[in-house]
Amino acid sequence: MKAISKWAFVAASLLAAGTVFGQTPAMNVLIGNSTANDAQAAINVRFAELLTKYSNGRLAASSRTGGSLGTNSQMLSTLQAGALQGMIIPTGFMASAVPEIGMFDLPFLLPGDPAKMTEFTVRSKAAARMREIAEQKGIHVIGFYGIGSQSLLTRFPVTKLADIQGKLFRVIPSPPRAGAYKDWGAVPRSMDFAEVYTALQQGTIVGIENPPDVIYKMKLYEVAKYFTRTEHSAFVMAILVSKKWRDALPKDLQEVVIRAGKDAITYADEINTKAQADALAAMRKEGSITVSDMPAAEIRKMRDLNREGVWKSMKNDPQRSAIVKLLEEDIADYFK
């Protein structure tokens, strides 16, 4: 009788584990990103939830926020190798692997509203070509979405372009971003996001660029008190999965992955506009930061310098010129 009870217990355990009657155990899936407690992290969580839900538990997806799986560059390399299933990443951090995707970082390129940024990427011929190129590098881009426009957060007041000249700013390691700051006479420095708070606190850098939500949720206003609205750069994100991993999935699960990613982008558009407005209002209300607008004449100077500088440089770059041309065609079509 004891033997029967023992085997009954074993059989029940196996059934619970999904290893009998042809059932397959759930596949563990990790989705990484570099920030925490902000809209980007919330979208990571939603993507993971949708993967699990739409697959009826066949994919057991978990979000890993705050850079717990490594830096953006480390996660991207791991994803290309197939050891990380998915991630959410600023397109500028993809420039080392897919230089063409970094062209979303060209200054004064996209409209400022997050949903309009997303709409632009959906309609964009350049974006479609970027996705094709990324596929060849082992990266499947489900889609792009906009977080919002980036402006300047500094340790000192900024009322004119001359105020930032000679000053050290942290930028994403993307040639268009670095080029923009060089055009303005500032000094760009590439740095992982996890290092930014301490670097600002210690004065290793004196400024950064980011949308209000990131600045507020990551508490960067504690170490840099001046937010100057320039809205010079669009912050475009990508939802990625490993091509190697996706291609090995059954056809129905491949479709689940795409559906979950696209629905996560829809969710992103719903929350990002509100997140930016709420963060800016909160910082103003708390008096934790001085918010001002860069004068229009100074913005024109910045734009003109970029058009003669980094834009021309990227147009003349053999690897990037075709994408820049497509982007210019996209802009003309979008705003006609």
Per-region residue spans from a language model:
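N-terminal signal peptide c-region/cleavage motif recognized by signal peptidases
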Residues: A17-T19
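Bacterial N-terminal signal peptides that target proteins for export
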Residues: M1-V10
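N-terminal secretory/targeting leader peptides
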Residues: Q23-K116, K125, M130-K336
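Catalytic cores of large soluble enzymes that bind and process phosphate-bearing ligands
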Residues: V122
